[in-house]
Amino acid sequence: DQFYIASAATSTEEIWNGIGNPVYPPAREELARHGISCKGKRAVQLTKADYDKYDYILGMDHWNLKNMLRILKADPEGKVKLLLDYSDNPRDIADPWYTGGFDVTYSDVVEGCEAFLRYLQNIKKL
């Protein structure tokens, strides 16, 4: 009950006539290998209104960051960051659409989520 987590695209490449595509099959397969279902999930795009809905808006790479700031117009509260900024090894997370490394991307996302959780615990948000 402490978290509301959503995923949103920074482009419309996977959204046609207002309807988002389902999760890309190789990504869905990687998630399934880890017991994670993405059934019913479809692409949605980040909106300016999302800024007020969320305490943190995390991107995967610097290209995401640039696009998030373009969509949001500003980040006066410092909510927009890269997921791996919270890790001991800050870096971009490679887009597996281009690399094919869905397993590597999954590992990087897990690393970032675990680091972000530790950050929240350290600042007493949990």
Spans of model-derived segments:
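A structural signal for well-ordered alpha-helical scaffolds and beta->alpha junctions
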Residues: 20-24, 61, 113
